[in-house]
Amino acid sequence: MAFDDLRSFLQALDDHGQLLKISEEVNAEPDLAAAANATGRIGDGAPALWFDNIRGFIDARVAMNTIGSWQNHAISLDLPPNTPVKKQIDEFIRRWDNFPIAPERRANPAWAQNTVDGDEINLFDILPLFRLNDGDGGFYLDKACVVSRDPLDPDNFGKQNVGIYRMEVKGKRKLGLQPVPMHDIALHLHKAEERGEDLPIAITLGNDPIITLMGATPLKYDQSEYEMAGALRESPYPIATAPLTGFDVPWGSEVILEGVIESRKREIEGPFGEFTGHYSGGRNMTVVRIDKVSYRSKPIFESLYLGMPWTEIDYLMGPATCVPLYQQLKAEFPEVQAVNAMYTHGLLAIISTKKRYGGFARAVGLRAMTTPHGLGYVKMVIMVDEDVDPFNLPQVMWALSSKVNPAGDLVQLPNMSVLELDPGSSPAGITDKLIIDATTPVAPDNRGHYSQPVVDLPETKAWAEKLTAMLAARK
């Protein structure tokens, strides 16, 4: 069953024992973020968290860590909670091929129950805001989806973007938003500012898990997140029309904020503890003016803790980064077998491939760095043979330790682009990139002595299946 809203997803998590309801009174700071942080430190299978007794807030409901374990991620895809990670990614890939599935426009969204306009807006009254890390410069919306359109082609449904961007709440109806240059919203903003125009946006909070996953997925510029959400949930994704902008927004959201990114206006935003596990510091960022708020009665506020991995954002971004990189590489290089870009939104990628000829694996690694996502993220690539599973780190370490000769297997590319949030970049946004070729050399690259590999015995696969069945029967 596909989830049309956050509430049905929370119910499914609860039904599977993956929602922990905390009824005791807690402090907004530091308890909410600290509890979410702790879910990444207590082992596999961490639950989502629900708080409804928060000191200082009246009738507030906060959900955290909803996708913050492989069990929760599986449930979001309507898979059994115990589905292995690799099978979840394989299913993601299978459903990807359903694209596009046209969305379903619905009337009477629950978020239309209450509205506030103009100077009457006070986000501090509507949202139970709290800091996520003690060095953050303010309150942040970090799991909301932002909808924008191409100002030069506003009726092109595919060019309408749905993405997750951090936003600092700076006033009653004022936000600071960080449009990463490699992301579609930055291109929309650039086009608007060239014309001297504000960029209208709609911000959706408290969303179903599939559109949240899509907001973190690097699609091509003209691929619709709503059509891909339909493919991923295997049914048309429900949308509704936002009343002020006329944009397409999720039908099941808890809160809709509408307004504009003000043209050519920048103010200091940050610091903020980022997915890189480091604070990003303060920078001049865009300013958002909110002109209309629509929200459900008793809305659920959802936030996401992020810091040193693993936290919820790693579960959210991991498969959502692997799959598009795999699909884009596979389309050009059918030899590619698998892509593991689970680490820090793909700043590191491990790619397995067959090889046509010597040097082929390095060409694949270079192409990974020049995909739409790779331009801003893929900083290091480890290339491995087709018989090495990039999701099996012991196998990857074996390939690195036995097949890499630093004299010829390291390719360093100077002065390449990367997102400014990468703490290793210097200056911010510029870095050297590295390809590590841990594949077996093939002609005409005849280095090394790899003619006598030890392979699994022919009967090993059958015995593995037999032992697995015996263990399952014993349990």
What do the predicted segments below correspond to?
Residues 1-272, 277-287, 291-475:
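Extended, highly charged
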